[in-house]
From Swiss-Prot:
Active site: 9 (tele-phosphohistidine intermediate), 87 (proton donor/acceptor)
Protein name: 2,3-bisphosphoglycerate-dependent phosphoglycerate mutase
Organism field: Streptococcus mutans serotype c (strain ATCC 700610 / UA159)
Reaction(s) catalysed (UniProt annotation): (2R)-2-phosphoglycerate = (2R)-3-phosphoglycerate
Annotated site residues (Transition state stabilizer) in this chain: 182
Keywords, ordered alphabetically: Gluconeogenesis, Glycolysis, Isomerase
N-terminal signal peptide: none
Task of the protein: Catalyzes the interconversion of 2-phosphoglycerate and 3-phosphoglycerate.
Metabolic or biological pathway: Carbohydrate degradation; glycolysis; pyruvate from D-glyceraldehyde 3-phosphate: step 3/5
InterPro entries from the UniProt entry: His_Pase_superF_clade-1 (IPR013078), His_PPase_superfam (IPR029033), Phosphogly_mut1 (IPR005952)
Gene Ontology molecular-function annotations: phosphoglycerate mutase activity
């Protein structure tokens, strides 16, 4: 029986300020740092031993991964970073206050942008200060691959190859895996793992804490799903 632990990053400074974050590289808040530490402690209490870990290329997820591994006494575990585990790209909403966006565009429209499976938010301008096109961490990517906006459908389409190439093979090899990622990249993978419908995934929320655990048999059928400490 192998285990996959999903840890959404702890609260970020922009979570705290109620801003759309997406691919903007925002740090953890003080509360978020503590959540990551507490995640590690829960993992240690549950005696889950990892063989490898995966995270995005965004600071808040990287720090959460490192802290969770450190406080579960597993900081030595190999960690691979990939842009494919990044948060969903919120396009032109990035950096905007969620309440102010609702006032400007209407509650219903903002809700559709946030929760629908296949509706895109407004695209980010190429010269936007938060544009990934000029960010060095994406220098090895073809410019056409870098998104200017994503919905959950597109997020799953770019995360799924990483699942199939890296994460699923590790689980099939009997390895326990830690994934430190983001609310929507985790939601996308949960949709695939549980084969949820487009409508059902709309009601799924991934909290900053505690970590979500899946247990699988040798054929990657889910045998258990639970949040640590609950």
């Amino acid at each position: 029986m192998v285990k996959l632990v999903f840890a959404r990053h702890g609260e970020s400074e922009w979570n705290k300020a109620n801003l759309f974050t997406g691919w903007a590289d925002v740090d953890l808040s003080e509360e978020g740092t503590q959540q990551a530490i507490d995640a590690g402690k829960l993992i240690k209490e549950a005696d889950i031993k990892f063989d490898l870990a995966f995270t995005s290329v965004l600071t808040r997820a990287i720090k959460t991964t490192n802290l969770a591994l450190e406080y579960s006494d597993q900081l030595w575990v190999p960690v691979e970073k990939s842009w494919r585990l990044n948060e969903r790209h919120y396009g032109g909403l990035t950096g905007k206050n969620k309440a102010e966006a609702a006032e400007k565009f209407g509650d219903e429209q903002v809700h559709i942008w946030r929760r629908s499976y296949d509706v895109l938010p407004p695209a980010m301008a190429k010269d936007d200060p938060y544009s990934a096109h000029t960010d060095r961490r994406y220098a090895n990517l073809d410019d056409t691959v870098i998104p200017d906006a994503e919905n959950l459908k597109v997020t799953l389409e770019r995360a799924l190859p990483y699942w199939e190439d890296k994460i699923a093979p590790a689980l099939k090899d009997g390895k326990n895996v830690f994934v430190g990622a983001h609310g929507n990249s985790i939601r996308a993978l949960v949709k695939h793992i549980k084969q949820l419908s487009d409508d059902d995934i709309m009601g799924v929320e991934i909290p900053n804490f505690p970590p979500l655990v899946f247990e699988f048999d040798e054929n990657l059928n889910v045998t258990a799903e639970y949040y640590l400490g609950k």
